[in-house]
A protein has these predicted regions:
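Interfacial/gating helices of multi-pass transporter permease domains
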Residues: 19-41, 168, 172-173, 220-228, ...
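Membrane-proximal transmembrane or re-entrant/amphipathic helices at the cytosolic face
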Residues: 459-520
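Signature of the first transmembrane helix
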Residues: 1-52, 89, 93, 118-119, ...
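Membrane-interface junctions at transmembrane-helix termini in multi-pass inner-membrane proteins
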Residues: 123-144, 355-385, 396
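C-terminal transmembrane helix end/exit motif
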Residues: 159-163, 181-214, 415-464, 489-505
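Alpha-helical transmembrane segments of multi-pass membrane proteins
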Residues: 105-127, 341-366, 381
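Short membrane-interface helical motifs at transmembrane helix boundaries
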Residues: 87-107, 325-343
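Helix-loop junctions and terminal segments of transmembrane helices
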Residues: 48-63, 274, 282-303, 316
Length: 520
């Protein structure tokens, strides 16, 4: 799964600048980003909680030998997801133009309309993924994710190039159709895996007597599905709803600061590109630690509180081992990264926003730990407070001419710091889980500084030498790659020598062949 996640995120990272370019720059990307924010909000309402509920219920029921009811729970949740997907798809399609007006980007209506069927497809897709993950079969999810992203990118590029002569509205629609086709391809794959898996299970358990296995009523199954799914859905809905509100506010407040509509759309698109770039490392950071969370939940349920604290701190340790150097590197090397990816302006914005990787990674992990110790309602409340404060600050700060788009940077940091502090207080006071954040970030920060000391001379020397005969793109790209390689080696060696990482940490983060070459 982790290798598939990395592959998907790399493809996604490369797709953003390419799409930005073929849509005509940040102003065109702003239209796509607005449509995509609407889709992201509706998508999490249908797929954030119910697949988790399916996975959890299927795991619990199969562990007690109740495979028949595990399948029944899956079918029940799948029906709910399909019904919800149909309703939300129809709402998106019917109200595409009013929603686009609310988003303050009327050209995005066609993108919203063409994304509507994707909600239903993804609802069904997530149901099958949840079931197969609950049966401990991760291969279908991994394979389908990679295929989905490749098909999405390929179809989107072809359609955008074919339709952009008809204007930005149609070009964005082409990109949105690519999303639907990618999801449909993934759905075909998981259904095929599901069918084969069911056939194998029938052969494996033929003639098995299930009469002695305790059974749950349909009402009880439904209650469990809702109990497991609703808190996660609400939490994700608040977060993505906040992003949608930000998107609707931003362009209007930039115009209130005295900027033209085109300049406002350009800056809005610039922020969209920056956030999409930051989403990639943030997702990698959180996915690295997420496997520890069921262990934390199990330890807490068994009242092993000391071990719960230990595992929670270890999850944060892994988070900071990756998040700290990524934040530092994106801050310092934002300019050459933008050149390498073929993006226009916006490197300064990425540099200022880079440490949101660290903060958002922390908040996501805190929310997951709080879910594990039965404090998800509190985590949701604190996230909601952060979203509300962010919307208010965006409204005020973005309209200040001297700040404009950088007002959104300030509000972003504040919106993460608020739930971070409140989550920490809640975990310590109510559950006795103290995360030693300062201590856990100290060594990665020191080693991150050493990483810069090792990588910056490599970058500057390469930039100087190549600059004499090569163009800007080649010079910056090669210099950045060499600096990154030097920085990675220096960072991990420094972490080993300072005791920041041991062999078990390296085995979780680096492939075996790379560990062998670096002697880590």
């Amino acid at each position: 799964m982790s290798a598939a996640n990395i592959a998907v995120k790399v493809v996604s990272l490369l797709f953003v600048p390419f799409l930005n370019k073929i849509l005509g720059g940040e102003a065109g990307y702003s239209v796509y980003y607005s449509a995509n924010q609407v889709f992201a909000f509706v998508y999490v309402l249908t797929t954030a909680g119910l697949p988790v509920a399916i996975s959890k219920l299927v795991t619990e029921l199969t562990s007690t030998g109740n495979r028949k009811q595990a399948k029944q729970a899956f079918r029940m949740a799948r029906t709910l997801m399909v019904l919800l997907g149909i309703v939300l798809s129809v709402i998106m399609a019917i109200f595409a133009k009013p929603i686009a007006r609310y988003m303050n980007n009327e050209d995005s209506w066609m993108g919203i309309l063409t994304l509507a069927p994707t909600v239903l497809i993804c609802s069904l897709l997530s149901a099958y993924r949840g079931y197969l993950q609950g049966m401990k079969n991760m291969t279908p999810t991994a394979v389908s994710q990679v295929v989905e992203q490749i098909v999405h990118v390929a179809v989107s590029v072809v359609l955008v190039l074919g339709l952009r002569s008809r204007g930005i509205v149609w070009a964005v629609a082409g990109a949105s159709i690519g999303t639907a086709v990618g999801a449909a391809a993934a759905l075909i794959i998981v259904i095929k895996y599901y069918g084969q898996y069911q056939q194998d299970q029938r052969v494996l358990h033929a003639g098995e007597d299930l009469r002695s296995v305790p059974k749950l009523t349909n009402e009880k199954l439904l209650k469990l599905i809702l109990y497991y799914s609703l808190p996660i859905t609400i939490n994700s809905g608040i977060q993505y709803g906040g992003n949608m509100i930000d998107t609707s506010i931003m362009k209007g407040r930039l115009m209130a600061a005295g900027l033209s509509e085109y300049d406002s759309r350009t800056l809005h698109g610039m922020m969209g590109v920056t956030r999409q770039l930051l989403n990639v490392p943030t997702a990698l950071v959180t996915s690295l630690c997420i496997s520890l969370l069921p262990v934390i939940a199990g330890l807490y349920a068994q009242k092993k509180y000391a071990e719960t604290r230990q595992k929670a701190n270890y999850a944060f340790k892994l988070c900071y081992i990756i998040a700290v150097p990524l934040s530092i590197a994106m801050c310092v090397y934002a300019e050459p990264l933008y050149v390498m990816l073929g993006l226009g302006s916006g490197a300064k914005l990425l540099s200022y926003m880079s440490f949101s990787i660290l903060l958002l990674g922390t908040v996501h992990l805190q929310s997951s730990v709080m879910q594990s110790v039965n404090e998800l309602f509190s985590a949701t409340l604190f996230m909601g407070i952060g979203v509300l404060v962010k919307a208010i600050l965006n409204y005020i700060l973005i309209a200040i001419p001297s700040l404009n788009i950088y007002g959104a940077v300030i509000s972003t940091y504040v919106s993460y710091i608020i739930p971070l502090i409140l989550n920490h207080i809640c975990l310590v006071r109510k559950r006795g889980v103290r995360i030693k954040m300062f201590r856990l970030t100290l060594i990665p920060m020191i080693c991150g500084g050493l990483m810069l000391v090792g990588s910056m001379p490599v970058y500057l020397l390469s930039d100087f030498l190549l600059g004499k005969f090569a163009g800007t793109y080649v010079t910056e790209t090669i210099s950045l790659i060499l600096a990154a390689a030097a920085g990675i080696v220096v960072y991990f060696y420094a972490m080993k020598k300072t005791g920041g990482m041991d062999s078990s940490d390296f085995s979780l983060i680096l492939p075996a062949n790379l560990r062998k070459k670096l002697k880590l």
